[in-house]
From Swiss-Prot:
Cellular localization per UniProt: Cytoplasm
PANTHER family xref list: ELONGATION FACTOR P (PTHR30053), TRANSLATION ELONGATION FACTOR KOW-LIKE DOMAIN-CONTAINING PROTEIN (PTHR30053:SF14)
Domain of life, per lineage: Bacteria
Protein name: Elongation factor P
Source species taxonomy: Bacteria, Pseudomonadati, Pseudomonadota, Alphaproteobacteria, Rhodobacterales
Length: 188
């Protein structure tokens, strides 16, 4: 489906010369004199190469038809990461390069959004927040309670996050998956 370049947003998938690209950033520039343009940074899905394109804001760009659905994570093996669609029970294998650094968040039964094109997974969206357990943390240094100080902690999935002083080993916490920041103590 053709769309004007100025309508492209982060996460959109475009088809340029038969290759799929996922939009990383899209900015519209309106100079005082001259034609407004849209600057788009993209990543080629096939090999991960980053590309930067500039179009006139009114130019037509081919937007790929992408199917986005919820999937449940099942397990990981030599083939890749296995997900199941909860309604039809269809299973799909996702390659490690699509999952990327988010693999540390995957737990059995976790619900994620997968974007597929021609039944091939092209991107994955993790939940905004996940609950993890702290395995080890440094002891509290006396006198650090006046300001909002944080201390490093190691989680069960191997992540290193900064947590408030009152968090100790064995505590379950909620972290933000985008910036790995502490959100709150888990309520379970």
């Amino acid at each position: 489906m053709k769309v004007i370049a100025s309508s492209l947003r982060k996460g959109n998938v475009v088809d340029i010369d038969g290759r799929l690209y996922v939009v990383l950033t899209a900015q519209n520039f309106h100079p005082g004199k001259g034609t407004p343009v849209t600057q788009v940074d993209m990543r080629r899905i096939s090999d991960g190469t980053k590309v930067s394109e500039r179009w006139k804001t009114t130019e037509q760009v081919e937007r790929a038809t992408v199917d986005e659905r919820e999937y449940d994570f099942l397990y990981e093996d030599g083939e890749g990461y296995h997900f199941m669609e909860p309604v039809s029970y269809d299973q799909v294998v996702v390659s490690p390069d699509v999952v990327g650094d988010g693999k540390v968040f995957l737990t059995e039964g976790m619900r994620v959004y997968l974007q597929t094109h021609n039944d091939v997974a092209i991107s994955i969206e993790f939940p905004q927040k996940v609950t993890v357990e702290i395995t080890e943390t440094e002891p509290v240094v006396k006198g650090q309670t006046a300001s909002s100080s944080y201390k490093p902690a190691m989680c069960t999935n191997g992540l290193r996050v900064m947590v408030p002083p009152h968090i100790s080993a064995g505590t379950r916490i909620v972290i933000n998956t985008e910036d790995l920041s502490y959100v709150e103590r888990a309520k379970d």
